[in-house]
């Protein structure tokens, strides 16, 4: 696992995502494990690393509401406005899923958790990647989420393809 610093080598992390790799990076809440949500191979690898059931579903993060435009098409105008409205804190939304979200992301749910990230590293990853990425807590099932780079190493060692350096922040959850 190579360490990278934002934004100098961000393109290398994106190349890993495009090759169906798995990366670790800081988010608003804890360290995240991420991959391309359209790659079933990459998503299943994340789930294996975490020993997590596919039935639970995964969260997606994006750099802006535009990255979720196709998902928002079926929402009523008021719900769209609430989602698009600027918030002081990063907020996780549970949005009804549609055919743009693969079943390995939604699990046994008819909704998907999405967040517009404000974290500079996570936002940069989504911007350069050009679409949302998977963002699940960086921990094996039953262990507390990693809150430091050393904890990420302790949990996963060299099992990750890339490690993006940085610091974590905090977030909120709203159900629509």
Where are each of the predicted segments found?
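Active-site-adjacent structural elements in enzyme catalytic cores
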Residues: 1-174
């Amino acid at each position: 696992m190579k360490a990278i610093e934002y934004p100098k080598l961000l393109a290398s992390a994106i190349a890993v995502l495009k090759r169906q790799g798995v990366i670790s990076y800081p988010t608003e809440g804890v360290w995240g494990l991420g991959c391309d949500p359209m790659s079933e191979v990459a998503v299943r690898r994340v789930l294996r690393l975490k020993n997590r059931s596919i039935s639970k579903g995964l969260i997606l993060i994006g750099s802006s509401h535009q990255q979720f435009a196709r998902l928002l098409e079926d929402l009523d105008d008021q719900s769209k406005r609430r989602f698009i409205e600027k918030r002081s804190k990063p907020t996780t939304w549970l949005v009804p899923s549609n055919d743009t979200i693969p079943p390995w992301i939604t699990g046994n749910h008819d909704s998907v958790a999405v967040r517009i990230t404000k974290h500079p590293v996570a936002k940069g990853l989504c911007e350069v990647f050009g679409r949302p990425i998977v963002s699940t807590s960086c921990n094996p099932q039953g262990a507390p989420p990693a809150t430091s780079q050393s904890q990420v190493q302790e949990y996963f060692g060299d099992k990750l393809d890339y490690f993006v350096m940085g610091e974590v922040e905090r977030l909120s959850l709203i159900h629509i």
